[in-house]
């Protein structure tokens, strides 16, 4: 029996929107869930992308460090210029851009369309709090 070999170029950018203080485990679970649901390999992740206010977000920073992923962050002024399929007025009201996950993924990947539109992940465990929004774009 021959072993199967799969090669994955690191060309997927994962846009992440999350509440302040979300744990590394919660963010990791959200990414794993979305990748599993869409039959994508996490080995193809180039990095995570978010709004610049998350540049020191412990959960994001820890996950990127452990996985050896890049973390790109962008100011709201840039993210709000990105055309996204699912803008949110609620998000716009709070952080001055209608999108974080979708806009950050698109901007990081330097592309115009998403591989996976925003997916909102909430933990199944009642004691674990937080919400993570994930979107995925593929760089060329």
Predicted regions and their residues:
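Conserved mixed alpha/beta catalytic, RNA-binding, or beta-rich assembly cores of soluble enzyme
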Residues: 1-54, 137-140
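Short low-complexity stretches enriched in small and charged residues
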Residues: 2-6, 70-72, 89-90, 107
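C-terminal edge-of-domain segments
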Residues: 6-8, 105-140
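Predominant activation on well-ordered alpha-helical scaffold segments within soluble catalytic domains
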Residues: 28, 32, 61, 100-104
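Short C-terminal domain-edge/linker segments immediately following a structured domain
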Residues: 43-47, 78-80, 103-105
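Long, charge-dense
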Residues: 51, 56, 60-100
């Amino acid at each position: 029996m021959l072993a199967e070999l799969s090669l994955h170029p690191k060309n997927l950018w994962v846009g992440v929107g999350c509440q302040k203080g979300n744990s590394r485990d919660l963010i990791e679970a959200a990414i794993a869930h979305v990748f599993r649901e869409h039959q994508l390999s996490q080995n193809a992740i180039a990095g995570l992308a978010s709004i610049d206010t998350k540049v020191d977000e412990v959960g994001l920073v820890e996950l990127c460090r452990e996985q050896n992923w890049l973390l790109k962050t962008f100011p709201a002024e840039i993210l709000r210029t990105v055309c996204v399929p699912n803008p949110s007025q609620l998000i716009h009201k709070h952080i001055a851009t209608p999108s974080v996950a979708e806009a950050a993924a698109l901007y990081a990947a330097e592309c115009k369309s998403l591989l996976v539109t925003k997916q909102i992940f909430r933990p199944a465990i009642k004691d674990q709090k937080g919400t993570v929004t994930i979107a995925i774009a593929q760089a060329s």
